[in-house]
């Protein structure tokens, strides 16, 4: 998130140096929501009290989903550079687009589907396992779309393992996956966990390729 802010600040500096927008200088108000949906809404409300006219963010999926709903009530333009859940910009239940929300990245369905296509069609794998964090919109979204697409192509998902936020030991899940004999493992998780998962996979003898 800090990298995103640094780039926003650089862009702001460049825009203001070139006269701003419609002759007006821009100002960024930044608050840390700590990756929490409730805290994100609290920060948004505080920023509205300070007179913001547009929202850039959030960075990750769960708080962005909360902000998408909240910003709609204010009819405030919102753009995210990195939140990938389809529901950020589209409500599948009502088949409506969230007209005030925009994104500058791909979606969970796109990522999960394309990775399944790559694994099955390009790499030739027919048996896959998945390990992902449960209760996390981003991780679950990618896992679900990968599984559905891989099976629709004719592949077999031999195992799906989950872990909880804050876990640091994945050996039990990885040992279970090893016993199911996959040719490849899909690991749609954040880099902090992925590094540990890969190291522990090696320690239990799970030597198949990981995709993520």
Residue ranges, per PLM feature:
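Short, small-residue-biased leader/transition segments that mark boundaries at the very start
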Residues: 1-5
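Signal peptide-proximal N-terminal region
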Residues: 6-28, 151-156
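Solvent-exposed loop/turn segments at secondary-structure junctions
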Residues: 33-38, 54, 60-65, 83-89, ...
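Periplasmic-binding protein-like
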Residues: 47-59, 77-81, 129-133, 181-191, ...
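Flexible loop/hinge segments that line or gate small-molecule binding clefts
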Residues: 76-102
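An alpha-beta-alpha
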Residues: 96-165, 184
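Extracellular/periplasmic bilobed ligand-binding domains
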Residues: 142-212
């Amino acid at each position: 998130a800090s990298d995103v802010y640094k780039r926003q600040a650089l862009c702001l500096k460049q825009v203001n140096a070139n006269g701003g927008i419609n002759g007006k200088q821009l100002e960024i108000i930044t608050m840390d929501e700590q990756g929490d949906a409730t805290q994100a809404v609290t920060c948004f409300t505080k920023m509205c009290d300070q007179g913001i006219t547009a929202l850039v963010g959030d960075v990750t999926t769960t708080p962005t989903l909360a902000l998408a709903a909240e910003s709609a009530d204010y009819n405030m333009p919102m753009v995210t550079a990195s939140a990938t859940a389809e529901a950020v910009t589209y409500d599948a239940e009502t088949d409506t687009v969230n007209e005030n929300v925009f994104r500058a990245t791909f979606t969970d369905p796109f990522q999960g589907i394309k990775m399944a296509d790559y694994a099955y069609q390009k790499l030739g794998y027919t048996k896959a396992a998945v390990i992902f964090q449960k209760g996390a919109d981003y991780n679950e979204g990618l896992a679900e779309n990968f599984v559905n697409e891989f099976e629709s192509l004719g592949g077999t998902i031999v195992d799906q393992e989950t872990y909880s936020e804050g876990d640091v030991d994945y050996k039990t899940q990885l040992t279970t996956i090893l016993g199911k004999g996959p040719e490849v493992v899909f690991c749609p998780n954040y880099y902090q966990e992925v590094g540990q998962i890969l190291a522990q996979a090696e320690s239990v003898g799970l030597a198949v390729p990981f995709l993520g």
